[in-house]
A protein has these predicted regions:
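Bacterial N-terminal signal peptides that target proteins for export
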Residues: 1-7
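Active-site glycine-rich loops that stabilize anionic/oxyanionic intermediates
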Residues: 59-63
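Cap/lid segment of the alpha/beta-hydrolase catalytic domain
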Residues: 89-115, 221-222
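Alpha/beta-hydrolase active-site loop
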Residues: 105-132
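The feature captures the conserved acid-bearing segment of alpha/beta-hydrolase catalytic domains
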Residues: 164-248
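C-terminal catalytic histidine-bearing segment of alpha/beta-hydrolase fold enzymes
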Residues: 223, 243-287
Length: 287
């Protein structure tokens, strides 16, 4: 998807929404147009909201989107942000289209970028900007578990305008190499999606790997496949290993490296606790 096309799309979506009412204070929902697949989005706007950014929240494999919206209320109140949490239901968005972003079709062929699930996110952001009549409203993203997997791969292929992308406790990572097959690495992808320029841009993306130090057991729909186990025995180890590999590669090549890693002590594979932790603010808004 070219930057010119994306800019035109965002402008059109913002203009369409300009005459709609702004997001109401408290919890709510809206439907975001998306061709034949409209997306239901759960929201929370603090009653004291002024002009803070948007926080797009991504649910886990359980698709419990309303819970995730509620988990993020503490972040909304603490930082004065509008929370928007899209539902990627299992029927329309199985793991190939959610955790792996729809990069490949059911036959393993690369799809056009407009068909990627990542391409839905700019539409949601544009819709919110239109509702709020703030076409330059900045946005941040955070996802836990399967939502974290979605975001690490989004960071590689379509980071958009996100100020910061926070992947919390993902079960597998996209390592910056062509040895591991996609979605564990860039192996098997065509050159235009796996060459050094792609990996260089990935390492320059504003990605935070946010880990609970007690997420160190193979539980909660853990990826115990051979490809997964290459990355480490548990989520904590995998996150640390991916960050170290990325940092080392960037240093060796002299590339920009904008990743961060943040750990919160004593928390396991629990989105509610990860979002409520003091370190969540550092993961999102720290420098």
């Amino acid at each position: 998807m070219s930057s010119r096309f994306l800019a035109a799309l965002l402008c059109a979506l913002v203009c369409r929404a300009l005459h709609a009412d702004p997001i109401a204070a408290g919890p709510g929902t809206f439907e975001c147009p998306n061709g034949t697949e409209p997306i239901t989005v759960f929201t929370y706007k603090p009653p004291t909201y002024k002009d803070g950014p948007v926080l797009v929240v991504f649910h886990g494999v359980g698709r419990n989107v309303e819970d995730y919206r509620n988990f993020a209320i503490t972040l909304a109140e603490r930082f004065g942000v509008i929370v928007v949490t899209p539902l990627f239901d299992k029927d329309r968005f199985p793991s190939s289209r959610y955790q792996r972003g729809g990069l490949l079709d059911p036959n393993g062929k690369t799809q056009a970028s407009a068909a990627w699930t990542y391409a839905v996110i700019p539409k949601i952001v544009a819709h919110v900007r239109g509702l709020e009549a703030k076409p330059k409203l900045p946005y941040y993203m955070i996802g836990h578990s399967a939502g974290g997997q979605f975001l690490v791969r989004l960071a590689a292929f379509m980071p958009g305008e996100a100020v910061r992308i926070v992947a919390a406790n993902p079960g597998s990572h996209l390592f910056p190499d062509r040895v591991q097959q996609f979605g564990y690495g860039f192996g098997g992808l065509p050159d235009e999606l796996s060459n050094d320029d792609v990996i260089r841009r990935y390492l320059a993306a504003p990605l935070t790997i946010y880990l609970g130090t007690a997420d160190n057991t193979p539980e909660h729909s853990f990826d115990a496949s051979p490809a997964g186990m290459v990355q480490g025995p548990h989520r904590l180890a995998r996150g640390r290993a991916c960050f170290a590999a990325a940092q080392t590669l960037a240093k060796e090549r002299g590339w920009a490296f904008n990743w961060r890693t943040v750990e919160t002590p004593g928390i396991g594979h629990e989105a509610a606790f990860m979002f409520a932790a003091q370190e969540a603010g550092d993961a999102l808004f720290g420098k």
